[in-house]
């Protein structure tokens, strides 16, 4: 049923002449059949393999990000999300793939880690699982804030379930980042992971004023796509980010995509949403 939902959307995208790429974030249990502990079964690994095999049969382009990672070490110990360093590597890998396989012309400088500042704060992050068990059981993670070392200038518009419409202008740090998120000291009340974008929103649109072409992508994502899409904003003139879980506008998503007229529509989903029909319900 879920696969049919994806096929339905892809058919509509093809009619519009828009290439589509599905990007699979694996989750910690997606690298082997081994369970999290003795006696607990792990269905994630086989479910991922089966799902991607179906995409192969349907000739749908996808990226299995497990092939770009060395294993579950790319995730936080206290959280289910991948680290910001992993997110940067995935975003840069996507940029190189789009250049080599899809005819994009992304500036290689935006893909080069040496053009970014990596500031690591020790014992600064207590993730979702860590907040449930406590820091003395789970320990603490280091948290790395990655920002461009080059000049940036953005206009960002956000549609939030809680705060409505807002706009930001300025540098990457002033627009894509949220300075209210503490990335230096761990917290039981908030997550440094959301220092990128500020959280999950129904829709966010970033216009990069330093890129003077008309390059544009639409990314439909869950929380695994938050830092990844933040880094993608340095590669395109316009990036539209949509989270179906929080999208409440009366405007149909198909119309939003058509108006954006993107060069590509991209899904970035973790393995936990393969069983959620609503995540592929594009109206």
Which residue ranges define each predicted feature?
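Extracellular glycan-modifying ectodomains
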Residues: 1-283
